[in-house]
Structure formats: structure tokens, C-alpha cells
Amino acid sequence: VEEGDTEAIVIQRMVAQLDSTLTELDIEGRAQALGLTPYQLLTVASLIEEEAGTDEDRPRVARVIYNRLAEEMPLQIDATSCYVKNEPGGCRLTEADLASDSPYNTRNRQGLPPTPIASPGRASIEAALNPADGDWLFYVLDAEADDGSHFFTADIDEFNQARARCREAGLGCG
């Protein structure tokens, strides 16, 4: 952003950069190979953008999303409900938020939310296009890590144990 730039100029540059990135990454063809539209792929990338604590987590979060979609499980991504609340600087979800029938409440709805919830960066788009290999269905902040990374598992009991450790550490794990 340069001094004197208007909002319109900044937005035009952002759109041009995104268009260039999407063309370079062949999002049309590669999304289709994943069984998604480009818009759905950008929605997945936006979820990754909001959820991943580290760059290393991005492809793993992508894999969890795709695995849960394949299993017809709700995504249970709290960031989608936080998007609706529009609370800058963090979000604390209430029981009412989690019970909401909002189309963005992926706790109780299957499939992707109706729109992206953030503007994904290139790393999140690449992760959506290149998910890690794995059978994971769950992830939670890793209470033993200090870098914002997550613990990934396919086992609900392991997940519940990791979530309990996360809560004990005061990390606000759902």
C-alpha cells in the first residue's frame, strides 16, 4: 500500500494479485480434480487460513476437512461461527452460538459454509490444492507446543484426551 492509495486502488491490487495466483496455480483444473468448484476450493482455503496455527498445519487441516466431507461429518470448525459474530480480536462462542441454525454453523451442519470466511493467502490455497496424506478426522491446539500448532488424530478418544490437556492449559479449546 502506498501513501495516497484509495480503498478502491488497494482492493483492485488485491483482486489482481489473487487472480494472478489462481491462474498460476491452475485452480480451475486442480479444483475439478478434487471434485470441487474453484469457489468451493477457495472456501476450503479460507477455513485453512483461519484454523491453521502454523504453515506445517495447513495441509493437515486441509486433509481433515476433506476427510470429514468424505465421511459426511459436520466440519465442526468454530471459526465459521466466529465469522458470523464478526468480533475483531478473537471470539468466544456461547452455547447459543453453537446451537444456532446459521448456515455458517459447521458444528451442526454438514458440508462447507456458503461462502469463504476469510481471504486466503497463497499458502492456504496451496494446502487446499495439496492436502497432506492422512486419515485424521480431528485436531485441537497442541497443549505441549508453544507455536500454535495442532494435534491431529483419527481416534476420538485421543482427540478427547488432547482436548482435555488443551483445556487444562487454558488454551480455550472447544
Language-model features, listed with the residues they occupy:
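Bacterial extracytoplasmic/cell-wall-associated proteins, especially those involved in peptidoglycan
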Residues: 1-174
